């Protein structure tokens, strides 16, 4: 998001602010997934992720989410546990989530802009 839009989102109450935080978490997860993919052949590398439910409830605006190491992933003999199929699935799912959230946020911003410009008068 552009700096002005991010500031605008932070200043919005309730759902818009929550959408902004949710999108921040999705962005952070995308970076982790990209790192996981980049390290798929690195001996000893352990997959990292974000616990969305915990982080969404506890994360303050602007604070970086804590990473977790997902359990139950198959480890290779060199100690690496990156599952490229899992990472590709996460990228696709999160892209869809981000698109939905950004559409909802655009709608909320449009309502506020119309109210500010006087277009919301009945």
Which residue ranges define each predicted feature?
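Amphipathic alpha-helical polymerization modules
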Residues: 2-122
């Amino acid at each position: 998001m552009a700096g002005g839009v991010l500031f605008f989102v932070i200043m919005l109450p309730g759902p818009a602010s929550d959408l902004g935080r949710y999108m921040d978490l999705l962005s952070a997860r995308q970076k982790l997934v990209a790192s996981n993919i980049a390290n798929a052949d690195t001996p000893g590398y352990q997959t990292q992720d974000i616990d969305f439910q915990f982080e969404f409830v506890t994360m303050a605006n602007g604070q970086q989410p804590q990473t977790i190491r997902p359990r139950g992933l198959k480890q290779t003999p060199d100690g690496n546990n990156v599952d490229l199929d899992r990472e590709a699935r996460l990228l696709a799912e999160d892209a869809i989530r981000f698109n939905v959230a950004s559409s909802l946020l655009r709608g909320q911003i449009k309502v506020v802009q119309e109210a500010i410009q006087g277009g919301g008068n009945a």
